[in-house]
A protein has these predicted regions:
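C-terminal helix of von Willebrand factor
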Residues: 123-137
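Conserved N-terminal substructure of TIR/SEFIR domains
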Residues: 2-72, 102, 108-109
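Conserved TIR/SEFIR loop-to-helix hotspot centered on a Trp-containing motif
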Residues: 82-100
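Glycine-rich, charge-decorated loop segments at or immediately adjacent to ligand/cofactor-binding or catalytic sites
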Residues: 112-125
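Short beta-alpha junction loops
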Residues: 83, 107-114
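Structural motif corresponding to alpha-helix initiation and N-cap regions
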Residues: 60-63, 91, 127
Length: 137
C-alpha cells in the first residue's frame, strides 16, 4: 500500500509537493491497514490514500513490483504486530526498504500489542506522530 502525503510548508499543505509512503503490513493485519486507509480518507486528515497493494504470491515478479514501489517512495511505514514476526512478505518489504536505504518507521498496529520488530523503530499510532515523521522526511 502507498499513501501520498501533502508536505507541510510553514504550517500549510503544499498540494503540489507530495510525499509517497509505502506501507508494509502482514496480510493478517489487513483490518489495521483498512483502518489506516479509513483515517487517511478523513477530510480532516492531511493524508491522501492511494491503494497500491500487491496480493500476488511472493515470487520474483511480486518482489520486482514491490521494490519498484519502495524505490519510488520517500519512506516506508510498517504496521507492527505479532503477525509481523511470521509475515514473510512484510519481512521482505522491510528488508527491501533497508537495502534501498529508505527511511523506515513502524507504528504499533494494535493498542495491546507492543511487538518488538528487530531493526524497526516503532511508535504509537496517532496522526501527530505519523505526520511529524513524514514531515521530517
Amino acid at each position: 500500500m502507498q499513501v501520498l502525503v501533502p508536505t507541510a510548508t510553514h504550517g500549510e499543505c503544499d498540494m503540489a509537493a507530495k510525499k509517497t509512503i509505502f506501507v508494509a503490513f502482514a496480510m493478517k493485519d489487513e483490518r489495521a491497514r483498512d483502518f489506516l486507509k479509513g483515517q487517511s480518507l478523513n477530510t480532516n486528515s492531511p493524508f491522501e490514500y492511494i491503494d497500491m497493494s500487491v496480493k500476488e504470491a511472493y515470487d520474483a515478479e511480486w518482489k520486482s513490483r514491490v521494490r519498484t514501489r519502495i524505490r519510488r517512495s520517500d519512506g516506508v511505514l510498517a504496521l507492527v504486530s505479532k503477525n509481523s514476526l511470521e509475515s514473510s512478505g512484510q519481512k521482505w518489504e522491510i528488508g527491501c526498504a533497508k537495502e534501498e536505504k529508505k527511511p523506515l518507521r513502524g507504528i504499533f498496529a494494535y493498542r495491546d500489542d507492543r511487538t518488538n520488530l528487530s531493526g524497526v523503530s516503532t511508535m504509537i499510532w496517532n496522526w501527530d506522530s505519523i505526520k511529524k515523521w513524514i514531515d521530517d522526511l
